[in-house]
Amino acid sequence: MVPEMSERQEFQASEFAYLLENSSYDYGENETYFCCTSPPCPQDFSLNFDRTFLPVLYSLLFVLGLLGNGVVAVVLLSQRAALSSTDTFLLHLAVADALLVLTLPLWAVDAAIQWVFGSGLCKVAGALFNINFYAGALLLACISFDRYLSIVHATQFYRRGPPARVALTCVAVWGLCLLFALPDFIFLSSHHDNRLNATHCQYNFPQEGRTALRVLQLVAGFLLPLLVMAYCYARILTVLLVSRGQRRLRAMRLVVVVVVAFALCWTPYHLVVLVDTLMDLGALARNCGRESRVDVAKSVTSGMGYMHCCLNPLLYAFVGVKFRERMWVLLMRLGCPDQRGHQRQPSASRRDSSWSETTEASYSGL
């Protein structure tokens, strides 16, 4: 997926071309005019909405996402010798989210004015966006599976295996995401729309390719990771519910938030895209009012999905006690005074324990 502005413009252009190709004229005695298709719907409302809404939203998400994920990466790297498997996945997740939001200023310019960066950067920006879109979802699934093995089966899959096992898993995730992004390198290009008198970064393939790409995004970028997370955390909750102690109750609340946040951020977008795809395929009737509402809904719900990049630092790092302790240590190294007062500081051995031993997560809070 790339931000929805380009995809909508591409469909409008193809719709206009189809209209020209399928028009017929009858200059008979009465000089009548006949056209077999309806004219394209006016898009003034949705385009004006995008020009106002998307640049503001993308700019805000760029600042918050880069700052939050940057802090997570710095804190994790400051203690990289003591990183657990979950912490390593979180580091890669922070990098993926940061790289995704790095492309948002380009899409903000595309929405506000037009694409002014050429076809080369169009391909790179689109591929970078999609690589990190898929990586974010798949890394969350890896974290869920790691926690599931550790808590439900008391198996330290990565800790007791070869040291490179977690690194190889991350390499496999990035390689798979690069494979998923190949259509961006091949089919994305800057295209001038004569009807709109503007250039946009968009896909150049037929409707069948557009539908296939959307199915890939839905299955690989949402449904499969969500199913893995839901199953793993449902089993984790089953184990935690039969345990006692406030620490385990806090962990139970956190694992619920993990699945709920991912689902709430991305489900609306994929439902809207499903409706739009059904309209393209003719399964749902298309009219100008519905098309305009779907266009606006795609812009709003895609923004909700990108917000997940900003939530990840809060959900997977800042709620963890161990993360906050290490962040304070890093700040004190930089010369900041310790503002924690006389709070009790837990021993390092307890904070570094794995879930299978104390059921407390690494400082991700998972």
Swiss-Prot record:
Give the record's glycosylation annotations as residue positions.
Answer: 22, 30, 197
- In the record, what terms sit under GO molecular function? C-C chemokine binding; C-C chemokine receptor activity; C-X-C chemokine binding; C-X-C chemokine receptor activity; signaling receptor activity
Q: One cellular component GO annotation, for this chain's record?
A: external side of plasma membrane
Q: Which UniProt keywords apply?
A: Angiogenesis, Cell membrane, Chemotaxis, Disulfide bond, G-protein coupled receptor, Glycoprotein, Membrane, Receptor, Sulfation, Transducer, Transmembrane, Transmembrane helix
A GO term (biological process) for this protein? positive regulation of angiogenesis
Where, in residue ranges, is this chain on the Extracellular side? 1-55, 110-124, 189-221, 276-299
Cytoplasmic topology ranges? 77-88, 146-167, 243-254, 321-366
Give the transmembrane region(s).
56-76, 89-109, 125-145, 168-188, 222-242, 255-275, 300-320
Which coarse location class applies to the principal site listed for this UniProt protein? membrane
Q: Which region ranges are annotated with the description Disordered?
A: 339-366
Q: Membrane topology per the record? A: Multi-pass membrane protein
> Out of the domains of life, which is the source?
Eukaryota
Q: Where in the cell is it found?
A: Cell membrane
Polar residues: bias regions: 355-366
Cystine connections: 122-201
User: What post-translational modification information does the record give?
Assistant: Sulfation on Tyr-25 and Tyr-27 is essential for CXCL10 binding. N-glycosylated.
Residues bearing PTM Sulfotyrosine: 25, 27
Checking InterPro entries in the record gives:
CCR1-9-like (IPR050119), Chemokine_CXCR3 (IPR004070), Chemokine_rcpt (IPR000355), GPCR_Rhodpsn (IPR000276), GPCR_Rhodpsn_7TM (IPR017452)
Q: What function does the entry list?
A: Receptor for the C-X-C chemokine CXCL9, CXCL10 and CXCL11 and mediates the proliferation, survival and angiogenic activity of mesangial cells through a heterotrimeric G-protein signaling pathway. Probably promotes cell chemotaxis response. Binds to CCL21. Upon activation by PF4, induces activated T-lymphocytes migration mediated via downstream Ras/extracellular signal-regulated kinase (ERK) signaling.
Recorded family membership: Belongs to the G-protein coupled receptor 1 family.
Quaternary structure annotation from Swiss-Prot or TrEMBL: Homomer. Forms heteromers with ACKR4. Interacts with PF4/CXCL4.
This chain's protein is named C-X-C chemokine receptor type 3
Lineage of origin: Eukaryota, Metazoa, Chordata, Craniata, Vertebrata
